[in-house]
Amino acid sequence: STPLSKAEVTMDAGAYKDITDPSVFVKFELKPKQGEDNIYSDKEKVYLLAWTTTPWTLAANTALAINKNLVYAEVKVNGENFIVARDLLEKVLVDEKHQPVKYDLLKQFDGEELVGREYKPLLGENRGKNAHKIWAEDFVSSEDGSGIVHIAPAYGEDDFNMAQKHHIPVVHVLDEKGVYTEGEWLGSLIWDVNKDIAKTLKERGIVWKIKYIKHSYPHCHRCGTKLMYRAHPSWFMDIASMRLDMLKENSDNINWFPEHIKHGRFEKNIEMAPDWNLSRDRFWASPMPVWKGVDKDGKEHIKVVGSFDELYELSGK
């Protein structure tokens, strides 16, 4: 497996391909507040209905996200109580044949009331401190889905950034090849079992509804296989601390042909560039000359070696 940057993927017009995948509406059981019955429905189970297009990430769930500025509704559907963004009720509450589902509107409340509440782990395994809570995030909208977003920090950029901000556990359930390393689908490639996961969880009552969608999905521009987002330990160059120096160097000392690139595309790239990932773990790449060690006092040291001669000298031979 090979890590790829967004730029590498988007440079190839054919990297994004239209495919059909199962999306699922998942039932996360809301816990009552400590010391009192559920404030939304007396002594009845209440489920937060979250939508995801990646059923294979559900085993790594550690949080849910809502928008505190949206209004949410609790409804009763076939004897079950669901919480969904009010503006999305008509879109969500249809069956798999796209027919409206009858429901009773029980309550409406601001999203702010959900923030900080806890829910039961989806597949039974508690992922540790600060896991399985509801957080407010602006990226949650009423454009699509249910107004409630399943968060698996190891497998999505927004998810990971949210986890870093709130100190939410980042749980890996897949290796770098996309094969499960734990749980019921141990040893299976995610693309081989994605549909099976959706169907199995629906049979168990964890998934309320499966909706197949056609969407544009990134593929490797070399081999044509599907790509996955996966958090991976990496070395980064701190671009933010060097940005002004880089802009000055480009302006004062570099001549560009054609000239318009200098203060155009390249300068704009520097102005907007995020930290640069230096380590890609590619089997054909050169090793990074970074050495780490611990001295006799237990203090860690990092040394960047600039040449073979320097490395030879440091080796003490």
Task: Name the predicted role of every residue range.
Residues 1-19, 92-105, 109-114, 305-317:
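Amphipathic alpha-helical
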Residues 2, 56, 70, 87-88, ...:
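Alpha-helix/helix-capping structural signal
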Residues 65-67, 293:
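Short beta-strand-to-turn element immediately C-terminal to the catalytic PLP-Schiff-base lysine
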Residues 28-30, 52, 68, 76-79:
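Short, structured patches in soluble enzyme cores that scaffold and shape functional sites
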Residues 37-53, 81-91, 107, 300-310:
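Short amphipathic beta-strand/extended segments with alternating polar/hydrophobic composition
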Residues 63, 70-148, 157:
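Protease-associated
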Residues 1-59, 113-118, 127-130, 139, ...:
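Residue patterns forming the tRNA-binding/recognition surfaces of aminoacyl-tRNA synthetases
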